[in-house]
Amino acid sequence: MNGRGPVGPPRSGPVRSPATRRAGGDPLIRLFHVSKSYGPGSVALRDLSVEVRKGELVFLSGPSGAGKTTLMKLLFAAERPTEGQILVLGRNVARLGERRIPALRRRIGVVFQDFKLIQTRSIEENVALALQVLGRPPREVRSKAFAMLRRVGLQHRRHELPAALSGGEQQRVALARALVNEPAILLADEPTGNLDAELTIEIMDLVAAAAARGTTVLVATHDQALIRRYARRTLRLAGGRLLEDIPGGSI
């Protein structure tokens, strides 16, 4: 199995917003009629078709249970679809062999609401770990970890443990860890859910900067004020269905 499958859906293709149609190059993310069920009466996603191109920052909006987190899990192969096809960086996730999943995940950064930092390791070690598991040389690991911590404004606290940092600072560390390997895609699941308004903007500015450098970014959020502030393309989900694909600037 080579991790790739047929890309032509039997029905109409993914939804493209006007901004997506204007963008150059092939989409990095493509979903064709994707559904995800966890059993009878437990359908998380229903017939979702959409695509996202390089450098787009896209919000996933909707209430709890809308399917936002399930979609994120499908994109980095933590879950497999019940129906449909998912192409991420040219790989068919629905058919990707277990041995090929780590290679895909190396190109995807993930940020969670609860940070998921290793509490017994320093800030620098948390960020460096993302490079160490790839077998990067120690000198490169130290250099890139320091540079990324400087980008998020925490290089002066690199030797401290996560518990010594505020919630906003820990989220910046989580973001640095997700971006240190220069991923093609960044998935952020409610990255500002536990932060106040000032810290929310701080984190989102860093996320937007990553998109400006060419990273494709998906942000799941309940925060409508945040969506209005950044005025980017928004996929509005409810009951596992895509209700609207709203172009940036239209919200």
Where are these regions (language model features)?
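Helix-to-loop junction immediately C-terminal to a conserved catalytic motif
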Residues: F76
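Conserved ABC transporter NBD signature motif
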Residues: G84-N92, L104, K144
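ABC ATPase NBD coupling module
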Residues: V93-G109, P138, A212
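Short coil-to-helix segment of the ABC ATPase nucleotide-binding domain corresponding to the Q-loop/switch region
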Residues: R121-L129
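Conserved ABC ATPase signature
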Residues: L161-L165, E169-Q171
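Conserved catalytic motifs of ABC-family nucleotide-binding domains
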Residues: E182
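Catalytic Walker B motif of ABC-type/P-loop ATPase nucleotide-binding domains
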Residues: L186-D189
